[in-house]
């Protein structure tokens, strides 16, 4: 069976929903950011701080390559995984790519006081979210299916992911 690949902006519920979907479908679950942290033996924030975004993206590419080889997995990706088109090509080989989108104020609310978001360590995080969303929006269009999670519960999103997967894996 094909993998279920969850993409989308940070704090849209990819990991939380991914774990729920994996349990429901009896799939494995993997988070590419956690893979990167294991590879580097440090947090994503520390990687950004110590080595910068370019180094992080190299590690991310390696993690995606590894994750894409798996079968029967839900793969939650980092918010910027779409910035490298080869990542999406890799993930699509054996996966259905589902993108989560949300309004900026929902993303900001979900992030809350979480300090583990290196790209948002700025004076005006909501403005930064809007800017990043605008930059990434064209890349998110490469998904097989998009879900606006803004007004949905975790259970509703998980159900929508499963329905979309069942429809799309046939194609």
Curated annotation (Swiss-Prot):
Binding site for ATP: 11-16, 117
Pathway stated in the Swiss-Prot or TrEMBL entry: Metabolic intermediate biosynthesis; chorismate biosynthesis; chorismate from D-erythrose 4-phosphate and phosphoenolpyruvate: step 5/7
NCBIfam families given in the database record: PRK13947.1
Its job: Catalyzes the specific phosphorylation of the 3-hydroxyl group of shikimic acid using ATP as a cosubstrate.
Family membership: Belongs to the shikimate kinase family.
HAMAP family on file: Shikimate_kinase
PANTHER family xref list: SHIKIMATE KINASE (PTHR21087), SHIKIMATE KINASE 1, CHLOROPLASTIC (PTHR21087:SF16)
Name listed for the protein in its UniProt record: Shikimate kinase
Gene: aroK
């Amino acid at each position: 069976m094909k993998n279920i690949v969850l993409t989308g902006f940070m704090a849209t519920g990819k990991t939380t929903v991914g774990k729920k979907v994996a349990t429901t479908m009896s799939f494995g679950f993997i988070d590419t950011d956690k893979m990167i942290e294991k590879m580097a033996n440090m947090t994503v924030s520390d990687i950004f701080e110590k080595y910068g975004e370019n180094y992080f993206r190299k590690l991310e590419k390696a993690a995606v390559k590894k994750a894409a080889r798996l079968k029967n997995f839900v793969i939650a990706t980092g918010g910027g995984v779409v910035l490298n088109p080869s990542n999406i090509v890799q993930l699509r080989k054996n996966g259905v790519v589902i993108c989560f989108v949300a309004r900026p104020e929902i993303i900001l609310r979900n992030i809350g006081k979480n300090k583990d978001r290196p790209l948002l360590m700025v004076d005006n995080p909501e403005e930064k979210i809007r800017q990043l969303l605008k930059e990434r929006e064209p890349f998110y269009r490469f998904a097989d299916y998009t879900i606006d999670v803004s007004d949905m519960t975790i259970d509703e999103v998980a159900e929508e992911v499963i329905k979309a997967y069942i429809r799309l894996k046939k194609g």
